[in-house]
């Protein structure tokens, strides 16, 4: 067994933690958070119903996550986020909009997927604007790597989808290459897909578009 620590795709940059975010984090996480366990999570039990389950990896400040959950009450959503300000922000939005179909797991995505989700247990996975780690020496930190994609594919049901969005051209090319190398995945487009109606434009995205940045949506489905 290797003694080297795992390479993480994120750095815990705490950033500004507002009073409102801190209050939401401390008071609402026990209600809407799901603790890390070594047992598979039972979504039917958590949400009190049987519905399509969508996992979002890296929910950021949570605006997009909350909006998608608000617009799709027929689906259940699990957000994975490790940064406390973002967790607090999303918790506040869950409370504000009274979202009964959204919960948070505040832990590392790889560990969560390995321990808490079984094979063919998810209907969809969203990864919007993952850190591109643009410097070549940091490419090994990129979240989208063959072993992780294999894990994602395993956790999806046949017919389930993986949706990744990025504004970094080099990373988009890398993502396409990695996903095409997974034989259980098939692209829903030739290369990049049109932005689905369910993914709202973020403020970050709108600013980027004004600067001429191209947003690329990549959507693959599991075939078997």
From Swiss-Prot:
The active site is at 131. InterPro entries: SAM-dependent_MTases_sf, tRNA_(Gua-N-7)_MeTrfase_Trmb, tRNA_methyltr_TrmB_bact. GO terms for molecular function: tRNA (guanine(46)-N7)-methyltransferase activity. It comes from Nitrosomonas europaea (strain ATCC 19718 / CIP 103999 / KCTC 2705 / NBRC 14298). This is tRNA (guanine-N(7)-)-methyltransferase. S-adenosyl-L-methionine binds at residues 56, 81, 108, 131. It catalyses: guanosine(46) in tRNA + S-adenosyl-L-methionine = N(7)-methylguanosine(46) in tRNA + S-adenosyl-L-homocysteine. Catalyzes the formation of N(7)-methylguanine at position 46 (m7G46) in tRNA. Its EC number is 2.1.1.33. Substrate binds at residues 135, 167, 202-205. It is an enzyme of class 2 (transferase).
């Amino acid at each position: 067994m290797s003694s080297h620590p795992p390479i993480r795709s994120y750095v815990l940059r705490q950033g500004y933690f507002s009073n409102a975010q801190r209050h939401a984090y401390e008071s609402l996480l026990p209600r809407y958070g799901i603790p890390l366990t070594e047992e598979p999570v039972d979504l039917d039990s958590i949400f009190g119903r049987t519905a399509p389950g969508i996992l979002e990896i890296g929910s950021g400040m949570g605006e997009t996550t909350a909006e998608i959950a608000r617009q799709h009450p027929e689906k259940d959503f699990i957000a994975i986020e490790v940064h406390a300000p973002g967790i607090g922000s999303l918790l506040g939005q869950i409370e504000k909009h009274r979202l009964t179909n959204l919960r948070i797991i505040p832990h590392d995505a790889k560990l969560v997927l390995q321990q808490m989700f079984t094979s063919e247990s998810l209907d969809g996975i969203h990864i919007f604007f993952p850190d591109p780690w643009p410097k070549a020496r940091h490419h090994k930190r990129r979240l989208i790597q063959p072993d992780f994609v294999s894990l994602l594919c395993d956790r999806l049901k046949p017919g389930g989808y993986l949706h990744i969005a990025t504004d970094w051209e080099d990373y988009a090319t890398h993502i396409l290459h990695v996903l095409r190398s997974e034989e259980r995945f098939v692209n829903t487009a030739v290369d990049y897909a049109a932005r689905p109606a369910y993914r709202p434009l973020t403020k970050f995205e709108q600013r980027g578009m004004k600067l001429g940045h191209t947003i690329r949506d990549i959507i693959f489905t599991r075939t078997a």
